[in-house]
Amino acid sequence: MIGKLSGTLDDKNPPQVIVDCHGVGYEVLVPMSTFYNLPELGARVSLLTHFVVREDAQILYGFATSQERAAFRELIKISGVGPRTALSVLSGMSVAELAQAVTLQEGGRLIKVPGIGKKTAERLLLELKGKLGPDIGVAASVANDSQADILQALLALGYSDKEAAAALKALPSDVGVSEGIRLALRALGK
């Protein structure tokens, strides 16, 4: 398996790039988030990759971050979601946005991605719940350290990710930890 490519960026044509590694040019399909962050042609580039072998093709998918690659791998494990659809999802939203959509069970955000219908969005929400990593989900909904502490407190008290994130969203951004927990508990108690 090819896990990483480092070389010279020879060509950029969305969603495909060609990376020259010591005279061998590798075609790599990348999500748009990675594509927009690529350097100029002729510059050195390093991509984490996922290698897919099919009966009729061998395809490399490249990612700028390990979180993107991990999300891609989780997406392709889902029945009915292939590498192209997974690439489309990661092109349509960042990993943090995907994690937040899954945490808050917002299928409407997923439906906006080309190639994702209502049933596929529901399947993604169900299958990805808890699989994108707690650090990604927390980072998506937390603006500062006090909000992170409030979120952790609510989760420790047994509230679901969705309930805790919704309560956190309703709080003022400059609220302190103890006051934030009190306000969140009051909101959740209604």
UniProtKB/Swiss-Prot annotation:
Keywords: Cytoplasm, DNA damage, DNA recombination, DNA repair, DNA-binding. It holds the Pfam family HHH_5. Residues 1-64 are annotated as: Domain I. One of its GO terms (molecular function) is four-way junction helicase activity. Transmembrane segments: none annotated. Residues 65-137 are annotated as: Domain II. Signal peptide: none annotated. Residues 137-141 are annotated as: Flexible linker. GO terms for cellular component: cytoplasm; Holliday junction helicase complex; Holliday junction resolvase complex. Residues 142-190 are annotated as: Domain III. GO terms for biological process: DNA recombination; DNA repair. It comes from the Bacteria. It is found in: Cytoplasm. Belongs to the RuvA family. Homotetramer. Forms an RuvA(8)-RuvB(12)-Holliday junction (HJ) complex. HJ DNA is sandwiched between 2 RuvA tetramers; dsDNA enters through RuvA and exits via RuvB. An RuvB hexamer assembles on each DNA strand where it exits the tetramer. Each RuvB hexamer is contacted by two RuvA subunits (via domain III) on 2 adjacent RuvB subunits; this complex drives branch migration. In the full resolvosome a probable DNA-RuvA(4)-RuvB(12)-RuvC(2) complex forms which resolves the HJ. The RuvA-RuvB-RuvC complex processes Holliday junction (HJ) DNA during genetic recombination and DNA repair, while the RuvA-RuvB complex plays an important role in the rescue of blocked DNA replication forks via replication fork reversal (RFR). RuvA specifically binds to HJ cruciform DNA, conferring on it an open structure. The RuvB hexamer acts as an ATP-dependent pump, pulling dsDNA into and through the RuvAB complex. HJ branch migration allows RuvC to scan DNA until it finds its consensus sequence, where it cleaves and resolves the cruciform DNA. NCBIfam families: ruvA (TIGR00084). Has three domains with a flexible linker between the domains II and III and assumes an 'L' shape. Domain III is highly mobile and contacts RuvB. This is Holliday junction branch migration complex subunit RuvA. It comes from Albidiferax ferrireducens (strain ATCC BAA-621 / DSM 15236 / T118).
